[in-house]
Swiss-Prot record:
InterPro entries: CAT-like_dom_sf (IPR023213), Plant_acyltransferase (IPR050898). It holds the Pfam family Transferase. The keyword Acyltransferase applies. Keywords: Acyltransferase, Taxol biosynthesis, Transferase. The active site is at H164, D373. One of its GO terms (biological process) is paclitaxel biosynthetic process. It comes from Taxus chinensis (Chinese yew). This is Taxadien-5-alpha-ol O-acetyltransferase.
Length: 439
């Protein structure tokens, strides 16, 4: 299909404060929230919605409903209406000033179909979310931006930008589900938000070592990087899971299977020498690893970083099951070491993302962004926005649910050098055919 330019007319941005007066308070961030790779970053997402077939929703204005809902939910989440401040010791805290979250309404001159499912890299998509000027003093920036862009067909896109110091991905999805509940007319949230950052007392470096987010640094790029994707459909991923579980006699998750396949395929595509070692880093939700576990509704940062390492020759000559077991063991190791405050090997803390032997994976497929329903049904597609170029790097793979017009399964969004893209897809397809044929 011929690519059509996106034309978006943006209204003036406004600050939306809580719908009820709230006392001004100061809230401390946790030691994880204050890590360098967290406190100075934001993360963005686009949620795409089709026009509703319901006659009652035809005349409904999503921008108006979401703006009103935003004011209501900020009563429950006052930090998102506040601003960051720096303490004398250099830590950040949130002053709940009620200044508000930034809200923007926009209208596109196109139908929603112009967007496809965000698999193509198109800089014009950045028009769907206002980009915060990160060169500005963070004290002057809102901690949340919401932009609603309507299309001529009745569909719309909700673009959101969260300051990472206030929440992680799971916390952001929790907030958006609550925002959607308010937009649908609910008078009470189904999940009460919990701030309580004092529950995460990790001043001990033995704890903080498990939450190193510095791997988000972008490497030096010497070759054209292309955004592309690869889908492992639901039937195939289940075939492969069935095959490997018959061998190992234990449960394997879709993420473990897909990440092992990606690890092997990328290592082959990059032709890394057999004598070297390759490493993958991926996030794990540590909420249940704390003692006691963090309560439901806690939306602060609590994602630990698991590390799986293998020799290239062993990885490529071994089975898919072997790679899966290395990943499974790294998850167990992170959990056990965290609980016992064990000191890990310095090599495991080497997260230099400038090296092609180190790869970072992130799993968005189970966070729940696609379950956010403002009254038009669930999002038909969810995608990050590469405004700050943190994720647009050859060492980063993002696992998502495919768009609704694609087969169910796992969509692997990646940024590869043009010369490696074809080889990677060939290797993935070869593994899929090999394991599906066994069943």
């Amino acid at each position: 299909m011929e690519k059509t330019d996106l034309h978006v007319n943006l209204n003036e941005k406004v600050m939306v404060g809580p719908s009820l007066p709230l006392p001004k308070t100061t809230l401390q961030l946790s030691s994880i929230d204050n890590l360098p790779g967290v406190r100075g970053s934001i993360f963005n997402a686009l949620l795409i919605y089709n026009a509703s077939p319901s006659p009652t929703m035809v005349s409904a204005d999503p921008a108006k409903l979401i703006r009103e809902a935003l004011a209501k939910i900020l009563v429950y989440y006052p930090p998102f209406a506040g601003r960051l401040r720096e303490t004398e010791n250099g830590d950040l805290e949130v002053e709940c000033t009620g200044e508000g979250a930034m809200f923007l309404e926009a209208m596109a001159d196109n139908e929603l179909s112009v967007l496809g499912d965000f698999d193509d890299s198109n800089p014009s998509f950045q028009q769907l979310l206002f980009s915060l000027p990160l060169d500005t003093n963070f004290k002057d920036l809102p901690l949340l931006v919401v932009q609603v862009t309507r299309f001529t067909c009745g569909g719309f896109v909700v673009g959101v930008s969260f300051h990472h110091g206030v929440c992680d991905g799971r916390g952001a999805a929790q907030f958006l589900k609550g925002l959607a509940e308010m937009a649908r007319g609910e008078v009470k949230l189904s999940l009460e938000p919990i701030w309580n950052r004092e529950l995460v007392k990790l001043d001990d470096p033995k704890y903080l070592q498990f939450f190193h987010f510095e791997f988000l640094r972008a490497p030096s790029i010497v070759e054209k990087i292309v955004q592309t994707y690869f889908i492992i459909d639901f039937e195939t991923i289940n075939y492969i899971k069935q095959s490997v579980m018959e061998e190992c006699k234990e449960f394997c998750s879709s993420f473990e299977v897909a990440s092992a396949m990606t690890w092997i395929a990328r290592t082959r595509a990059f032709q890394i020498p057999e004598s070297e070692y390759v490493k993958i880093l991926f996030g794990m939700d540590m909420r249940n690893s704390f003692n006691p576990p963090l309560p439901s509704g806690y939306y602060g940062n609590s994602i630990g970083t698991a590390c799986a390492v293998d020799n290239v020759q062993d990885l490529l000559s071994g089975s898919l099951l072997r790679a899966i077991m290395i990943i499974k063991k790294s998850k167990v190791s992170l959990n056990d070491n965290f609980k016992s405050r064990a000191v890990v090997k310095p090599s495991e803390l080497d997260v230099n993302m400038n090296h092609e032997n180190v790869v970072a994976f992130a799993d968005w497929s189970r966070l729940g962004f696609d379950e956010v329903d403002f009254g038009w049904g669930n999002a038909v597609s969810v995608s990050p926005v590469q405004q700050q170029c943190e994720l647009a790097m050859q060492n980063y793979f993002l696992f998502l649910k495919p768009s609704k017009n694609k087969p169910d399964g796992i969509k692997i969004l990646m940024f590869l050098p043009l010369s490696k893209m074809k080889s990677f897809k060939i290797e993935m397809e070869a593994m899929m055919k090999k394991y599906v044929a066994k069943v």
